């Protein structure tokens, strides 16, 4: 008889982040704060953010370099569009805080049991989510997988990291996890249905899957993001490059999460759509804080985010630098009110 996941009779997280305070749903327009006279640019949070990412070692990994930045490469082909060096790791740690704020401080929206036993964080990046989750649930074994060894070596005793390509067959035994966490895998997955099928396979009966994704399209509710702006060009750049890379950047726009999760066999499917401001223009204090980190994430290492896709499109280094300068200037201009759409889908494996 297969082991079942612990019952979630006393869930740790709310069904809706709104129960914790103001978070902009996808249907709500973001209310703009008054702009003080003469204050058009916002300095954000500065350059003080520090991140410690000591590498683990593995002889099977190789890296390629584009304009001095390193990218994961498997057999000579880059497997991930974002840089895997320290600058980008710092940006991804900022993104973790930004994404957590977007869920009212929650690490998950699935109603997990207090005595959850084993969790898998797929595509864990710097490992920061897995570490925070392990701290929150000290009795739970947390495994984070990624193709690059950029996780810290000093971690809670109940967390470990493994080198694994989630686009290949997963090596974990069937029905071995209570919860599978999938976050910000946009541009990395050639077959989303297969990804959710793999998650279904390794989950215990009654276990939960959760998929959090962000749109690449930068929008505004008041048309402050102009069609010819660098902000408006951001999404189309990634979408055009995806035709060469082979992995979609329109996960949210094409609604790939919920149908794929349902097709895999999950039940009790829930979905949460929201907006993430990319500078501190909102009037609401919590949304303004989200916007501060949105700006910091977007400008901390813009090069590491866009360089690979720009290189795929044949841009020269000079063209990349000009675009990045324009993008950063527009993000910091408080007259612009940019945001991206977020979607979280969570569901349960039948018992």
Swiss-Prot record:
Concerning SUPFAM superfamilies, the annotation shows: S-adenosyl-L-methionine-dependent methyltransferases
What's one Pfam family the UniProt record gives for this protein? Methyltransf_23
Q: Indicate, by first and last residue, each region the UniProt record lists as having compositional bias (Acidic residues).
A: 31-50
Per the UniProt entry, the Enzyme Commission number(s) are 2.1.1.-
Q: Can you name one GO molecular function term for this protein?
A: methyltransferase activity
Q: Which UniProt keywords apply?
A: Methyltransferase, S-adenosyl-L-methionine, Transferase
Changes seen on gene knockout: Does not alter the amount of produced r-N-DMAT.
Region named Disordered: 1-53
Q: Which residues cross the membrane?
A: none
Checking PANTHER family in the record gives: ABC TRANSMEMBRANE TYPE-1 DOMAIN-CONTAINING PROTEIN-RELATED, METHYLTRANSFERASE
Under what name is this protein listed? Methyltransferase FFUJ_09178
Organism (species): Gibberella fujikuroi (strain CBS 195.34 / IMI 58289 / NRRL A-6831) (Bakanae and foot rot disease fungus)
């Amino acid at each position: 008889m297969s082991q079942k996941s612990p019952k979630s009779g006393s869930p740790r997280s709310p069904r809706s982040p709104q129960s914790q305070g103001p978070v902009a749903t996808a249907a709500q327009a973001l209310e703009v704060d008054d702009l003080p006279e003469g204050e058009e640019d916002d300095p954000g949070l500065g350059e003080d953010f520090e991140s410690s990412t000591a590498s683990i070692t593995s002889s099977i990994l190789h890296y390629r370099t584009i304009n001095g930045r390193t990218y994961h490469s498997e057999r000579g082909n880059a497997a991930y569009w974002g840089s895997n060096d320290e600058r980008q790791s710092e940006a991804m740690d900022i993104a973790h805080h930004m994404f957590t704020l977007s869920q009212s401080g929650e690490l998950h929206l699935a109603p997990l049991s207090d005595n959850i036993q084993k969790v898998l964080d797929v595509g864990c990046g710097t490992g920061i989510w897995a570490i925070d989750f392990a701290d929150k649930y000290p009795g739970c074994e947390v495994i984070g997988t990624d193709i690059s060894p950029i996780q810290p070596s000093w971690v809670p005793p109940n967390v470990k990291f493994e080198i694994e390509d989630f686009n290949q067959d997963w090596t974990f035994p069937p029905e071995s996890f209570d919860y599978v966490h999938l976050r910000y895998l946009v541009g990395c997955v050639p077959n989303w249905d297969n990804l959710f099928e793999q998650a279904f396979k390794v989950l215990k009966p009654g276990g939960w899957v959760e998929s959090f994704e962000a749109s690449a399209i930068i929008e505004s509710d008041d048309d402050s993001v102009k069609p010819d702006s660098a902000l408006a060009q951001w999404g189309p750049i990634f979408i055009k490059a995806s035709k060469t890379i082979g992995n979609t950047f329109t996960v949210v726009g094409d609604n790939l999460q919920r149908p794929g999760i349902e097709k895999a066999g999950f039940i009790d499917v829930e979905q949460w759509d929201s907006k993430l401001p990319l500078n501190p223009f909102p009037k609401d204090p919590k949304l303004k804080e989200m916007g501060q980190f949105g700006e910091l994430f977007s400008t901390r290492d813009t090069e590491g985010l866009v360089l690979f896709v720009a290189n795929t499109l044949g841009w020269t280094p000079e063209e990349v630098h000009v675009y990045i300068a324009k993008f950063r200037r527009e993000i910091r201009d408080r007259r612009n009110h940019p945001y991206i759409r977020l979607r979280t889908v969570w569901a349960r494996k039948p018992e």
